[in-house]
From Swiss-Prot:
SUPFAM superfamilies associated with the record: ClpS-like, Ribosomal protein L7/12, oligomerisation (N-terminal) domain
Keyword presence, Transcription: no
Family as reported in the entry's similarity comment: Belongs to the bacterial ribosomal protein bL12 family.
Glycosyltransferase found in the keyword field: no
Protein name from the UniProt record: Large ribosomal subunit protein bL12
UniProt cross-references to CDD domains, sorted A to Z: Ribosomal_L7_L12
Domain of life of the source: Bacteria
MF terms (GO), sorted A to Z: mRNA binding; structural constituent of ribosome
Quaternary state and interactors: Homodimer. Part of the ribosomal stalk of the 50S ribosomal subunit. Forms a multimeric L10(L12)X complex, where L10 forms an elongated spine to which 2 to 4 L12 dimers bind in a sequential fashion. Binds GTP-bound translation factors.
Transmembrane segments: none
Function: Forms part of the ribosomal stalk which helps the ribosome interact with GTP-bound translation factors. Is thus essential for accurate translation.
Length: 122
């Protein structure tokens, strides 16, 4: 299989399938896809705290009692299919969107909380 074929296959995968692929690769090769964290000095830590965070991860922490409405809302904001959205909601806590702008994150959070879900911006 050529590199281009692999890239094309990845492009055609859903978010849920990509997540499963990453987990399988981590398990198979004994590695972690988490970004390495560098230890910074005290001066750098103080400067970083002063910066306002511009990108947020939208995390569904609990579906609440109206699971069907939450699944519909998740499909709307993520573009996932019914099966993928249901699996995501059933598996809460799960990240719905990574590196979302503050406005997008707040809009997604408001839409999901409107139907009874509990959502965090991290």
């Amino acid at each position: 299989m050529k590199k281009e074929e692999i890239i094309q296959a990845i492009k055609e995968m859903t978010v849920l399938e990509l997540n499963e692929l990453v987990e399988a690769c981590e398990e198979e090769f004994g590695v972690s896809a988490a970004a390495p964290v560098a230890v910074a000095g005290a001066g750098a830590a103080a400067a970083g705290a002063a910066e306002e965070k511009t990108e947020f991860d939208v995390v569904l922490t609990d579906a609440g009692s109206e699971k069907i409405k939450v699944i519909k809302a998740v499909r709307e904001v993520t573009g996932l299919g019914l099966k993928e959205a249901k699996a995501l909601v059933d598996g809460a806590p799960k990240t719905l969107k990574e590196a979302a702008s503050k406005e997008d994150g707040e809009a997604i959070k408001a839409k999901l909380e409107e139907v009874g879900a509990k959502v965090e911006l991290k």
